[in-house]
UniProtKB/Swiss-Prot annotation:
It comes from Rhodopseudomonas palustris (strain TIE-1). GO terms for biological process: regulation of glutamine family amino acid metabolic process. It catalyses: [glutamine synthetase]-O(4)-(5'-adenylyl)-L-tyrosine + phosphate = [glutamine synthetase]-L-tyrosine + ADP; [glutamine synthetase]-L-tyrosine + ATP = [glutamine synthetase]-O(4)-(5'-adenylyl)-L-tyrosine + diphosphate. Pfam families: GlnD_UR_UTase (PF08335), GlnE (PF03710). This is Bifunctional glutamine synthetase adenylyltransferase/adenylyl-removing enzyme. SUPFAM superfamilies: Nucleotidyltransferase, Nucleotidyltransferase substrate binding subunit/domain.
Length: 990
């Protein structure tokens, strides 16, 4: 009867009803006796109610007996208030915890004495701690729900205590809050939750790490109140309310030592002092700590603003591999200090020991520090969320994410169970075999051995992933023989070593090494950089020895060192990443142009570290997103242009490096070059429009468009392509003057605007120029206005344009314009290209143009792949000729891209299949080789003087067995193309 009455009102949401298989009993008889012995001492109705719940739910009964056996702390909470236990067991834990917090807030809001608040918060803590522990032990909540509940409890406790203290201060007239019920709002007092509390990951018996800041001009302070003494006193009161131990316990231990320079600063710091400290003295561990920082109490708006100001300290603009060694040093020091240098079971510290929680956190945080500046999506607080994003962005493998996530959840569960024993902030397992046997049962295992097997498996997997990141001897120095690399050319041991590595000129290499090791170059004058470089040299020499021409590779790296103005980051990057060093060695050996770019701007190397580097080439949407991140916080027009230039140079460098490494087809690279240019053009168009309008206003109904011609229009760009552009505009005739302070008439307005636009591209800053711009393809060329109104452009194309201008128009593509204006321009272009034409006249004009080009540029150089007889110009002219002649009857032939136009012509039966089978492979061959030559050669290409690295890359790009075979194929191809050109269009050889 009692049993049914007690359990009848329970539904399946009640905590008691939701217990699953949990702990096991080490000594079932003794545990049952201990539990029953306590029940005997209770009032009969309480004992009957608790016993009935245990009988109804056997898993709950075992869990309660396990607590009596293994956890003095939880058993004390149970024995201290049996009614509290019944409340917790009968209610749904989610609703019960919410009600506990709500009731506590109501009580504290009405309290007038600090003692009342302290008592209320301790009652809250006791019941919430019991509820959360039971949800953990019974498997009712997953681990991260447990940590979030603990975090919410801590956060709300801090908020209640702080609000009470500020309410008291308001009553004393020391602050004048606009909202007396929420005196913290607008107070300028900021409480940051750090570490696990900041990330929603608080453990069961954790301290709470807080940093308290205040604004010097705190708006709610009374005029005669000094900020520092006031906020220090409030902070001390907050700490006292939460952590003072009394007969009814404590709420949370408070640790304020994560603030700047805690040994010499007060417990509350001004935001001005904090920002100055982080800018001048902030260390890597403080950057790592700030990843998880979160405003948890006080003025939350001011807290968010402060974190935004601190963000540049935490998130460096460029990849920061120096953080690797800093973080690893921190971890090593902790392990050494705590004697946790090996994996174990008995006594092992699951937090800071080998393979522990801290290694998982550091694994994630270090990579967040390295890349979070460039990739804002990595700026997340929770560890598991960071692992998820790192895997999604290919910074880590899916296997690493899964194994580290599983280990983290397991170790956090172990950590909680250890702390539940005595409510101690310990992370160490019991240190005897018998104690581990007992603990294993409390955790749900049937033996010490089964627990140890799982524990060691998780620890070893974590250590393996951590070691790959931190301890893999990234420089490779540990495996190399102990040679004095600075000994110079007289040291026979060094010379023998260099010969054994494959260097053919050891005397020269030894001399160069001596210069490096003595710090003779500008970049090596900084002691820390010089020391890092000396440690890196052995691995560098070994890696450069793998090049096709090792001696040339050393010379190329030497040129890079001499050209560097600052190189600490570059040396750090290369020393931590052997694959990157291999790639840079290839760049230096084959493409001096890219090497020079790297010397001027070492930060462009960052993109090579991005896991996406070897993936699919980014499309326009992804490029736009990256560009937006690059420009997000530019503070001025000049900084905006500098960042655009850096983005453009880095993109060129990355695409070029992929071409050299053979990891992207050259046609894709051509499109990628064009996509980068198009994104930059659109961005500059918008920026200049806004800047220009701020001075000159706007013309009513104005619209501007940028028309891409040439290689940008056809999306066939190379690393050295300039931009062929035409600016087209329109406006309402009834109001032709702009409405700005300095008004301009229509045509003058757009001419001046176009000049400003060109200047944005071509002005040289510290980061060089964006692009060279060529506007000679506009109507009337240099003789015409720099910008064309749409009706004038249409009239010119219809009535005055030469055949060569219509040939060029086949590549015209609107790349930046409002949609409606874009459509109008495209209609004009299509109308021009699809009008009827006389094939004989067009053929004659094209042949004449080709002869003129040959006379001006020459056509006898086989390696002038553009202008040689049978070169790319011949193929372009064939594709353009076919479009002009046939577009009237077959408009589907039209395409801005040469290969696509040839495909269309073949599909429509306008180009013979046999001719297409010559022209298409020829175009691809020329484009493949041209991409390489534009990257690697500034002047004309001469095979006799070209380096072996370049020739090797060209042979690979041309899919030939060797260079002589490649050259023979080029000559044969040119002969075949010229024959088709003469047959289709006519020429001197026809």
């Amino acid at each position: 009867m009692i049993f049914s009455a007690i359990t009848a009102d329970l539904d399946n949401t009640a905590l008691a009803a939701r217990f699953g298989a949990g702990p096991r009993l080490y000594d079932p008889v003794l545990a049952a006796e201990r539990w029953a012995g306590w029940l005997v001492d209770l009032a009969p109705e309480q004992a009957d109610a608790i016993a009935a719940l245990g009988n109804a739910f056997p898993d709950l009964q075992i869990a309660l007996q396990s607590i009596a056996e293994a956890s003095p702390y939880l058993f004390d909470l149970i024995r201290g208030d049996p009614v509290r236990l019944l409340r917790v067991l009968r209610g749904a834990p989610e609703q019960r915890l919410a009600k506990l917090l709500e009731d506590a807030e109501t009580f504290v809001a009405a309290a007038s004495a600090e003692d009342e608040v302290m008592a209320a918060l301790r009652r809250l803590k006791a019941e919430a701690a019991l509820l959360i522990a039971l949800c953990d032990i019974g498997g009712i909540w997953p681990v991260m729900q447990v940590t979030q509940a603990l975090t919410d409890l801590a956060g709300r406790s801090v908020q209640m205590a702080l609000r009470f203290l500020l309410r008291l201060e308001a009553g004393r007239g020391r602050i004048v809050p606009p909202n007396p019920d929420c005196p913290e709002q607008g107070s300028g007092l900021i409480v940051l939750a750090m570490g696990k509390m900041g990330a929603g990951e608080l453990n069961y018996s954790s301290d709470i790490d807080l940093i308290v800041f205040y604004e010097l001009d705190a708006p709610t302070l009374a005029p005669d109140i000094e900020p520092q003494p006031f906020f220090v006193r409030v902070t001390q009161g907050l700490s006292r309310i939460l952590q003072q131990r009394r007969g009814d316990g404590y709420v949370f231990r408070v640790d304020l030592r994560l603030r700047p320079d805690p040994a010499s600063t007060p417990v509350a710091l001004s935001t001005v002092s904090a920002l100055d400290y982080y800018e001048r003295e902030g260390r890597t561990w403080e950057r790592a700590a700030m990843i998880k920082a979160r405003p948890c109490a006080g003025d939350l708006v001011a807290g968010d603003a402060l974190l935004s100001e601190i963000a540049p300290f935490v998130w460096r603009k460029h990849l920061d591999f120096a953080a690797l060694s800093d973080v690893h040093d921190m971890k090593r020091q902790m392990q050494t200090y705590r004697g946790q240098t090996e994996i174990a079971v008995e006594g092992h510290n699951v937090k800071v020991g080998r393979g522990g929680i801290r290694e998982i956190e550091f694994f994630a945080q270090t990579q967040q520090l390295i890349a979070g500046g460039r990739h804002p999506e990595l700026r997340v607080r929770p560890t598991l969320e960071a692992l998820e994003i790192l895997a999604a962005r290919n910074w880590i493998t899916i296997q690493a994410r899964d194994e580290l996530t599983e280990a983290y959840l397991f170790l956090r569960k172990v950590e909680h169970r250890v702390q539940m024993i005595a409510d101690e902030q310990t992370h160490a397992l019991p240190d005897t075999v018998e104690a581990i046997e007992r603990f294993s049962r409390f955790l749900g295992y049937d033996s010490r051995d089964s627990f140890a097997r799982d524990l060691l498996g998780y620890l070893e997997r974590v250590q393996g992933h951590y070691a790959k990141l931190f301890e893999g001897d990234p420089t490779g120095t540990a495996k190399l023989p102990p040679v004095d690399y600075g000994a110079g050319p007289e040291d026979t041991r060094l010379l023998d070593h260099l010969l054994s590595l494959g260097y053919k000129k050891p005397l020269m290499i030894a001399t160069t090494l001596q210069q490096w090791m003595t710090g003779g170059y500008r970049v090596l004058k900084v002691e820390t950089t010089q020391r890092a470089f000396r440690e890196f040299v052995p691995a560098l020499i070994e890696e450069l020895a793998r090049a096709e021409q090792p001696d040339d590779a050393v010379n190329a790296f030497d040129r890079l060192l001499q050209a560097l103005h600052r190189g600490g980051r570059l040396i750090s990057l290369l020393s931590q990443n052997r694959e990157l060093l291999t790639l840079v060695a290839l760049v230096l050996g084959a493409a001096p142009r890219l090497g020079d770019m790297l010397a001027r701007q070492p930060q462009i190397l960052d993109g090579l570290i991005d896991p996406r580097f070897f993936g699919a080439m980014p499309d326009q949407a992804e490029l736009s997103a990256r560009l937006a991140v690059t420009l997000a916080d530019a503070g001025s027009y000049e900084e905006f242009l500098d960042r655009l230039r850096l983005f453009g140079q880095e993109s060129l460098f990355l695409i070029g490096t992929r071409i050299l490494s053979g990891t992207v087809p050259t046609q894709q690279a051509a499109v990628a070059f064009a996509d980068v240019a198009e994104g930059i053009v659109g961005t500059v168009h918008g920026l200049v429009s806004e800047q220009f309008a701020s001075t000159y206003g706007r013309v009513k109904g104005q619209q501007t468009a940028i028309l891409a011609m040439g290689k940008l229009g056809s999306r066939e760009m190379t690393a050295s392509s300039d931009l062929d552009l035409i600016l087209i505009y329109d406006f309402d005739d009834d109001q032709p003057d702009s409405d700005g302070e300095r008004s301009l008439h229509g045509a003058q307005y757009f001419a001046r605007f176009t000049q400003r636009l060109i200047s944005a591209f071509t002005t040289r800053t510290n980061y060089g120029v964006l692009y060279d711009v060529d506007m000679r393809l506009r109507p009337s060329g240099r003789a015409g206005p720099v910008a064309s109104r749409l009706d004038a452009f249409a009239a010119y194309q219809e009535q005055e344009a030469w055949t060569w201008e219509h040939l060029a128009l086949t590549r015209a593509r609107v790349i930046s314009a409002p949609p409606e204006f874009r459509s109008r321009i495209e209609q004009v272009i299509r109308a021009v290209l699809t009008r009827p034409r006389d094939a004989a006249i067009i053929a004659n004009d094209v042949a004449e143009m080709r002869r003129a080009i040959a006379q001006e540029k020459g056509e006898d150089d086989v390696w002038d792949l553009k202008y040689a007889a049978g070169g790319m110009v011949d193929i372009d002219f064939i594709a353009q000729y076919l479009q002009l002649v046939h577009a009237h009857e077959a408009p589907d032939i039209l395409h801005v891209n040469t290969l696509s136009a040839l495909d269309n012509a073949t599909r429509l039966g306008l180009l013979a299949q046999a001719d297409a089978e010559v022209l298409r492979p020829a175009a691809r061959l020329y484009q493949n080789l041209t991409q390489i030559l534009r990257l690697c050669v500034s002047e004309k290409f001469n095979p006799d003087t070209a380096g072996d690295d370049l020739l090797r890359v060209m042979v690979r790009a041309g899919d030939a067995p060797d260079f002589s075979s490649l050259q023979a194929r080029v000559k044969e191809t040119q002969s075949d193309v010229r024959a088709i050109f003469n047959r289709l269009i006519g020429g001197e050889d026809a």
